[in-house]
Amino acid sequence: MRLVVVAAALTGFLATPAFVSTQTQPAPSASLAPPPDAPPPHPVAPGPYAVSVISEPTLTTHTVYRPTDLSPFTAGQRLPIVAWGNGACSNAGLLFETFLTHIAGHGFLVIASGPKDAPLPAFASRVPGQARSQPDPNAGIAAGSTKDEDLIKAIDWAIAENGKSGSAYAGRLDPQKVAVMGQSCGGLQATAVAGDPRIKTVVIWNSGVFNEPNGGRGATLSGARKESLAKFHAPVAYFLGGPTDLAYANGKNDFSRLTTVPAFLGSIHSGHGGTYMHPGGGWFGEVGVAWLKWRLNGDQSAAKYFEGADCILCTDPIWEVAKKKIK
Protein backbone atom coordinates (compact mmCIF):
# COMPACT_ATOMS: atom_id res chain seq x y z
CA MET A 1 0.00 0.00 0.00
CA ARG A 2 1.26 3.49 -0.83
CA LEU A 3 1.65 6.06 1.90
CA VAL A 4 1.74 9.78 1.26
CA VAL A 5 2.36 11.87 4.35
CA VAL A 6 1.41 15.55 4.38
CA ALA A 7 2.09 17.36 7.64
CA ALA A 8 3.52 20.44 9.26
CA ALA A 9 5.94 18.47 11.42
CA LEU A 10 6.77 14.79 11.41
CA THR A 11 9.02 12.52 13.39
CA GLY A 12 9.47 8.84 12.82
CA PHE A 13 7.43 9.05 9.62
CA LEU A 14 7.32 7.16 6.33
CA ALA A 15 6.19 3.57 6.19
CA THR A 16 8.22 0.90 4.44
CA PRO A 17 7.57 1.32 0.69
CA ALA A 18 5.75 -1.45 -1.11
CA PHE A 19 8.79 -2.47 -3.12
CA VAL A 20 11.00 -3.11 -0.06
CA SER A 21 10.99 -6.63 1.33
CA THR A 22 9.60 -7.02 4.84
CA GLN A 23 12.56 -9.26 5.61
CA THR A 24 15.55 -7.87 7.46
CA GLN A 25 17.14 -5.14 5.37
CA PRO A 26 20.90 -4.67 4.93
CA ALA A 27 22.40 -2.04 7.20
CA PRO A 28 22.72 1.50 5.82
CA SER A 29 25.94 1.82 3.88
CA ALA A 30 28.16 4.36 2.13
CA SER A 31 28.64 1.92 -0.73
CA LEU A 32 27.59 3.24 -4.11
CA ALA A 33 26.59 -0.24 -5.26
CA PRO A 34 22.80 -0.55 -5.67
CA PRO A 35 20.91 -2.87 -3.30
CA PRO A 36 20.32 -6.32 -4.80
CA ASP A 37 16.57 -5.70 -4.89
CA ALA A 38 16.75 -2.18 -6.33
CA PRO A 39 14.28 -1.26 -9.09
CA PRO A 40 15.66 -1.79 -12.60
CA PRO A 41 17.35 1.12 -14.42
CA HIS A 42 14.94 3.74 -15.68
CA PRO A 43 16.46 5.27 -18.85
CA VAL A 44 15.52 8.89 -19.41
CA ALA A 45 15.39 10.64 -22.77
CA PRO A 46 17.77 13.60 -23.18
CA GLY A 47 16.53 17.16 -23.16
CA PRO A 48 16.11 19.31 -26.27
CA TYR A 49 19.54 20.97 -26.07
CA ALA A 50 22.95 19.58 -26.99
CA VAL A 51 25.30 20.07 -24.05
CA SER A 52 28.90 21.22 -23.75
CA VAL A 53 30.98 20.41 -20.68
CA ILE A 54 33.68 23.02 -20.37
CA SER A 55 36.29 24.63 -18.18
CA GLU A 56 35.88 28.38 -18.22
CA PRO A 57 39.15 30.36 -18.05
CA THR A 58 37.65 32.62 -15.39
CA LEU A 59 36.40 29.68 -13.28
CA THR A 60 38.93 26.87 -13.61
CA THR A 61 38.07 25.56 -10.14
CA HIS A 62 34.68 24.42 -11.45
CA THR A 63 33.16 22.58 -14.40
CA VAL A 64 30.36 24.15 -16.45
CA TYR A 65 27.57 22.12 -18.07
CA ARG A 66 25.49 24.20 -20.47
CA PRO A 67 23.56 24.12 -23.72
CA THR A 68 26.11 24.32 -26.52
CA ASP A 69 24.13 26.95 -28.42
CA LEU A 70 23.32 29.87 -26.14
CA SER A 71 21.55 31.93 -28.80
CA PRO A 72 18.01 30.82 -27.83
CA PHE A 73 18.50 32.13 -24.32
CA THR A 74 17.62 35.81 -24.35
CA ALA A 75 15.09 38.00 -22.55
CA GLY A 76 12.06 35.90 -21.71
CA GLN A 77 13.95 32.59 -21.79
CA ARG A 78 17.16 33.00 -19.89
CA LEU A 79 19.06 30.09 -18.37
CA PRO A 80 18.48 29.34 -14.69
CA ILE A 81 21.64 28.85 -12.63
CA VAL A 82 22.29 25.60 -10.74
CA ALA A 83 25.30 25.21 -8.42
CA TRP A 84 26.27 21.59 -7.65
CA GLY A 85 28.33 20.05 -4.84
CA ASN A 86 29.82 16.57 -5.37
CA GLY A 87 29.50 13.52 -3.18
CA ALA A 88 32.46 12.94 -0.84
CA CYS A 89 33.22 16.67 -1.26
CA SER A 90 35.16 15.46 -4.28
CA ASN A 91 37.12 18.05 -6.24
CA ALA A 92 36.32 16.41 -9.60
CA GLY A 93 33.94 18.26 -11.89
CA LEU A 94 33.10 15.20 -14.01
CA LEU A 95 32.11 12.92 -11.13
CA PHE A 96 28.38 13.32 -11.87
CA GLU A 97 28.78 13.97 -15.60
CA THR A 98 25.90 11.76 -16.78
CA PHE A 99 23.41 13.26 -14.33
CA LEU A 100 24.48 16.89 -14.73
CA THR A 101 24.60 16.66 -18.53
CA HIS A 102 20.99 15.55 -18.45
CA ILE A 103 20.01 18.52 -16.27
CA ALA A 104 21.81 20.99 -18.56
CA GLY A 105 20.15 19.47 -21.63
CA HIS A 106 16.81 20.69 -20.35
CA GLY A 107 17.92 24.32 -20.39
CA PHE A 108 19.95 24.95 -17.25
CA LEU A 109 23.43 26.30 -16.58
CA VAL A 110 24.95 23.81 -14.15
CA ILE A 111 28.20 24.64 -12.37
CA ALA A 112 29.82 21.73 -10.55
CA SER A 113 32.55 22.16 -7.98
CA GLY A 114 35.88 20.79 -9.13
CA PRO A 115 38.02 21.23 -12.26
CA LYS A 116 37.08 19.49 -15.48
CA ASP A 117 40.52 17.90 -15.83
CA ALA A 118 40.68 16.60 -12.25
CA PRO A 119 41.03 12.81 -11.99
CA LEU A 120 37.97 10.97 -10.78
CA PRO A 121 38.25 9.50 -7.28
CA ALA A 122 39.00 5.81 -7.00
CA PHE A 123 35.44 4.91 -6.02
CA ALA A 124 33.93 6.45 -9.16
CA SER A 125 32.62 4.54 -12.13
CA ARG A 126 30.59 5.57 -15.14
CA VAL A 127 29.36 2.04 -15.80
CA PRO A 128 25.66 1.82 -14.85
CA GLY A 129 24.98 -0.87 -12.27
CA GLN A 130 28.64 -1.61 -11.58
CA ALA A 131 29.41 -2.02 -7.90
CA ARG A 132 31.46 0.87 -6.56
CA SER A 133 32.97 1.37 -3.14
CA GLN A 134 33.16 4.78 -1.50
CA PRO A 135 35.59 5.87 1.19
CA ASP A 136 34.09 6.52 4.61
CA PRO A 137 32.26 9.87 4.18
CA ASN A 138 32.96 10.68 7.82
CA ALA A 139 36.72 10.51 7.42
CA GLY A 140 37.06 14.24 6.82
CA ILE A 141 37.90 16.42 3.87
CA ALA A 142 41.09 15.47 2.10
CA ALA A 143 43.47 18.13 0.87
CA GLY A 144 42.09 19.77 -2.25
CA SER A 145 38.50 18.75 -1.61
CA THR A 146 35.69 21.22 -2.15
CA LYS A 147 34.17 23.47 0.48
CA ASP A 148 30.80 25.06 1.14
CA GLU A 149 31.97 28.37 -0.30
CA ASP A 150 32.57 26.81 -3.71
CA LEU A 151 28.82 26.79 -4.30
CA ILE A 152 28.61 30.51 -3.56
CA LYS A 153 31.62 31.09 -5.81
CA ALA A 154 29.75 29.40 -8.66
CA ILE A 155 26.68 31.60 -8.18
CA ASP A 156 28.80 34.76 -7.91
CA TRP A 157 30.63 33.88 -11.13
CA ALA A 158 27.48 33.20 -13.12
CA ILE A 159 25.78 36.41 -12.06
CA ALA A 160 28.92 38.41 -12.83
CA GLU A 161 29.23 36.82 -16.29
CA ASN A 162 25.60 37.62 -17.02
CA GLY A 163 26.32 41.30 -16.52
CA LYS A 164 29.73 41.36 -18.21
CA SER A 165 29.94 42.94 -21.64
CA GLY A 166 31.54 40.55 -24.13
CA SER A 167 30.87 37.43 -22.06
CA ALA A 168 29.25 34.50 -23.85
CA TYR A 169 26.72 34.52 -21.00
CA ALA A 170 25.92 38.25 -21.05
CA GLY A 171 22.16 38.69 -20.76
CA ARG A 172 21.55 34.96 -21.18
CA LEU A 173 21.35 33.90 -17.52
CA ASP A 174 18.57 34.60 -15.04
CA PRO A 175 19.89 35.76 -11.64
CA GLN A 176 16.35 35.45 -10.27
CA LYS A 177 16.37 31.69 -10.90
CA VAL A 178 19.13 30.16 -8.79
CA ALA A 179 19.23 26.65 -7.34
CA VAL A 180 21.78 24.92 -5.16
CA MET A 181 22.06 21.12 -5.11
CA GLY A 182 24.46 18.46 -3.90
CA GLN A 183 24.87 14.74 -3.23
CA SER A 184 26.00 13.28 0.10
CA CYS A 185 28.74 15.63 1.33
CA GLY A 186 27.69 18.01 -1.45
CA GLY A 187 24.20 17.98 0.04
CA LEU A 188 25.68 19.13 3.33
CA GLN A 189 27.37 21.94 1.44
CA ALA A 190 24.05 22.92 -0.14
CA THR A 191 22.45 22.91 3.32
CA ALA A 192 25.21 25.11 4.68
CA VAL A 193 24.71 27.84 2.05
CA ALA A 194 20.92 27.59 1.69
CA GLY A 195 20.43 30.85 3.57
CA ASP A 196 21.83 32.88 0.66
CA PRO A 197 18.91 35.14 -0.35
CA ARG A 198 19.58 34.61 -4.08
CA ILE A 199 18.73 30.91 -3.85
CA LYS A 200 15.20 30.08 -4.99
CA THR A 201 15.28 26.34 -4.33
CA VAL A 202 17.49 23.75 -2.63
CA VAL A 203 17.76 20.10 -3.66
CA ILE A 204 19.43 17.62 -1.30
CA TRP A 205 20.45 14.24 -2.75
CA ASN A 206 21.34 11.25 -0.54
CA SER A 207 22.23 13.56 2.29
CA GLY A 208 21.27 14.92 5.68
CA VAL A 209 23.03 16.60 8.57
CA PHE A 210 24.51 14.11 11.03
CA ASN A 211 22.34 13.58 14.09
CA GLU A 212 25.11 13.72 16.68
CA PRO A 213 25.23 16.87 18.85
CA ASN A 214 27.01 19.79 17.20
CA GLY A 215 27.15 17.97 13.89
CA GLY A 216 29.27 15.08 15.17
CA ARG A 217 31.39 13.52 12.47
CA GLY A 218 29.64 15.63 9.84
CA ALA A 219 31.41 18.65 11.28
CA THR A 220 34.56 17.62 9.43
CA LEU A 221 32.76 17.57 6.07
CA SER A 222 30.91 20.87 5.96
CA GLY A 223 29.70 23.79 8.02
CA ALA A 224 26.17 22.36 7.91
CA ARG A 225 24.51 21.82 11.29
CA LYS A 226 20.95 21.09 12.32
CA GLU A 227 20.71 24.80 13.09
CA SER A 228 21.40 25.50 9.40
CA LEU A 229 17.93 24.19 8.55
CA ALA A 230 16.38 27.25 10.20
CA LYS A 231 17.97 29.39 7.48
CA PHE A 232 16.07 27.68 4.66
CA HIS A 233 13.85 30.28 3.02
CA ALA A 234 13.02 28.63 -0.31
CA PRO A 235 11.32 25.36 -1.37
CA VAL A 236 13.46 22.30 -0.72
CA ALA A 237 13.44 18.72 -1.98
CA TYR A 238 15.15 15.69 -0.46
CA PHE A 239 15.78 12.68 -2.70
CA LEU A 240 17.06 9.63 -0.84
CA GLY A 241 18.01 6.04 -1.63
CA GLY A 242 15.90 4.07 0.82
CA PRO A 243 16.87 2.26 4.04
CA THR A 244 20.25 1.08 2.72
CA ASP A 245 21.27 4.67 1.97
CA LEU A 246 23.72 5.88 4.62
CA ALA A 247 21.97 9.27 4.57
CA TYR A 248 18.40 7.96 4.76
CA ALA A 249 17.85 8.55 8.49
CA ASN A 250 19.66 11.89 8.47
CA GLY A 251 17.72 13.17 5.46
CA LYS A 252 14.40 12.14 6.97
CA ASN A 253 15.35 13.81 10.24
CA ASP A 254 16.22 17.06 8.46
CA PHE A 255 12.92 16.95 6.59
CA SER A 256 11.04 16.40 9.86
CA ARG A 257 12.52 19.61 11.27
CA LEU A 258 11.36 21.86 8.43
CA THR A 259 8.29 23.92 9.33
CA THR A 260 8.40 27.16 7.32
CA VAL A 261 9.14 26.26 3.68
CA PRO A 262 7.50 23.99 1.10
CA ALA A 263 9.32 20.67 1.30
CA PHE A 264 9.20 17.39 -0.60
CA LEU A 265 10.81 14.09 0.27
CA GLY A 266 11.09 11.30 -2.27
CA SER A 267 12.97 8.07 -1.68
CA ILE A 268 13.58 5.18 -4.06
CA HIS A 269 15.33 1.95 -3.07
CA SER A 270 18.63 2.68 -4.81
CA GLY A 271 21.14 2.95 -1.96
CA HIS A 272 23.57 5.78 -1.37
CA GLY A 273 24.68 5.76 -5.02
CA GLY A 274 21.24 6.67 -6.33
CA THR A 275 20.67 6.42 -10.08
CA TYR A 276 23.11 9.09 -11.27
CA MET A 277 25.07 6.73 -13.51
CA HIS A 278 22.04 5.32 -15.30
CA PRO A 279 21.28 6.73 -18.78
CA GLY A 280 20.14 10.31 -18.29
CA GLY A 281 20.65 9.92 -14.56
CA GLY A 282 17.73 7.50 -14.37
CA TRP A 283 14.94 8.34 -11.97
CA PHE A 284 17.04 11.00 -10.25
CA GLY A 285 17.65 12.72 -13.58
CA GLU A 286 13.94 12.75 -14.33
CA VAL A 287 12.75 14.05 -10.98
CA GLY A 288 15.62 16.53 -10.71
CA VAL A 289 14.67 18.17 -13.99
CA ALA A 290 11.01 18.18 -13.00
CA TRP A 291 11.70 19.87 -9.66
CA LEU A 292 13.91 22.55 -11.21
CA LYS A 293 11.43 23.23 -14.02
CA TRP A 294 8.64 23.62 -11.51
CA ARG A 295 10.42 25.67 -8.88
CA LEU A 296 12.55 27.87 -11.15
CA ASN A 297 10.45 28.09 -14.33
CA GLY A 298 6.94 27.66 -12.95
CA ASP A 299 6.30 24.68 -15.24
CA GLN A 300 2.92 23.27 -14.19
CA SER A 301 3.40 20.05 -16.13
CA ALA A 302 6.52 19.41 -14.07
CA ALA A 303 4.57 20.22 -10.90
CA LYS A 304 2.46 17.12 -11.50
CA TYR A 305 5.37 15.01 -10.27
CA PHE A 306 4.94 16.53 -6.81
CA GLU A 307 1.57 18.25 -6.35
CA GLY A 308 -1.68 16.61 -5.36
CA ALA A 309 -2.56 13.30 -3.73
CA ASP A 310 -2.36 11.78 -7.21
CA CYS A 311 1.04 13.25 -8.08
CA ILE A 312 3.21 11.14 -10.37
CA LEU A 313 5.60 10.08 -7.61
CA CYS A 314 2.78 9.74 -5.07
CA THR A 315 1.07 7.07 -7.16
CA ASP A 316 4.17 5.13 -8.19
CA PRO A 317 4.73 2.25 -5.74
CA ILE A 318 8.52 2.39 -6.05
CA TRP A 319 8.56 5.87 -4.51
CA GLU A 320 8.19 6.72 -0.84
CA VAL A 321 6.83 10.26 -0.53
CA ALA A 322 6.21 12.91 2.12
CA LYS A 323 5.25 16.55 1.67
CA LYS A 324 4.92 19.77 3.65
CA LYS A 325 3.22 22.94 2.44
CA ILE A 326 2.77 21.31 -0.97
CA LYS A 327 -0.77 20.34 -1.89
What are these regions (language model features)?
Residues 200-278:
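The feature captures the conserved acid-bearing segment of alpha/beta-hydrolase catalytic domains
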Residues 5-17:
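Bacterial N-terminal signal peptides
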Residues 270-273, 278-327:
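Alpha/beta-hydrolase-fold serine-hydrolase catalytic core, especially in secreted/extracellular enzymes
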Residues 77-81, 106-111, 175-177, 197-202, ...:
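Loop/turn elements at helix/coil->beta-strand transitions in domains of secreted/extracellular proteins
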Residues 17-25:
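Signal peptide processing junction and immediate N-terminal pro/mature segment
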Residues 55-173:
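Serine-hydrolase catalytic machinery in alpha/beta-hydrolase-like enzymes
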Residues 25-77:
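N-terminal cap/lid segment of alpha/beta-hydrolase-fold proteins
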Residues 154-231:
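Primarily recognizes the serine-hydrolase "nucleophile elbow" in alpha/beta-hydrolase
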